[in-house]
Design a protein with these regions (language model features):
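ABC family nucleotide-binding domain
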Residues: 2-214
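H-loop (His-switch) and adjacent beta-strand-loop-beta switch element
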Residues: 211-224
Length: 230
């Protein structure tokens, strides 16, 4: 259940000018990989993440996700694929401020029409897995940044997606919380989840097993870390 991009482009019209955010990206990510995507502002890395996450469609090219062609899907098909296969974690957490951590995590199951008792049971189990069972009744403003990001990770996991996409997940965290969050991603990868991480921080990218660098809408390097023999 891997990912394959072939000659993906994404163009935007700005006035009379056409700007290519992606200029022909070809890439394969195997199931169970931990990949970091790096690049300066305007490099195309966020556009690439949006296409990988089925949040946007390319202007041209092919995107196979689990052997399904995604590039030509309509909005409903994209949404179904996204909800089934992908969990998202964002820099700003994107939590609902007026409901508890527990209810935030359970929210995707509301859309999936899972019964309330079952969704709260599943949300409690996942909060326990990320070390927040004692704070499940807390509101987001009663949690630290690291704790809020744990809630966001738990929410991303609630539908048991095969792929986790994280866009600058440590951008608003202190160094200690960043380490804790990256260790969670590492454990999820050990459990078989595919992790795709966008970051501009080299020290965060080093947690990944493969680092892809994007510039001017093109991949300029793709490096796999050597595994220790120990």
């Amino acid at each position: 259940m891997g990912i394959m991009l072939k000659q993906i482009t994404k163009c935007y019209k700005i006035g009379e000018e056409t700007v290519a955010a992606l200029a022909g990206i070809s890439l394969t990510i195997e199931t169970g990989e931990f990949v970091a995507i790096m690049g300066p502002s305007g490099s195309g890395k966020s556009t690439m993440m949006n296409i990988l996450g089925c949040l946007d469609r390319p202007s041209s090219g092919s995107y196979l996700l689990a052997d399904q062609e995604v590039a030509t899907m309509n909005d409903d098909e994209l949404a179904k694929t996204r909800n089934k296969r992908i969990g998202f974690v964002f820099q700003n957490f994107n939590l609902l401020s007026r409901v508890s951590a527990w209810e935030n995590v359970a929210l995707p199951l509301v859309y999936a029409r899972v019964a309330e008792k079952e969704r709260l049971k599943r949300a409690a189990a996942i909060l326990d897995a990320v070390g927040l069972s004692a704070r499940k009744q807390h509101m987001p403003n009663e949690l630290s940044g690291g704790q809020r990001q744990r809630v966001a990770i738990a929410r991303a996991l609630i539908n048991d997606p095969s792929i986790i996409m994280a866009d600058e997940p440590t951008g608003n965290l202190d160094s200690r919380s960043s380490v804790d969050i990256m260790r969670i991603f590492g454990k999820l990868n050990e459990q078989g989840k595919t992790i795709i991480l966008v970051t501009h921080e080299p020290d965060i990218a080093q947690y990944a097993k493969r680092v892809i660098t994007v510039r001017d809408g093109l991949i300029i390097s793709d490096e796999v870390k050597e595994q220790s023999a120990c």
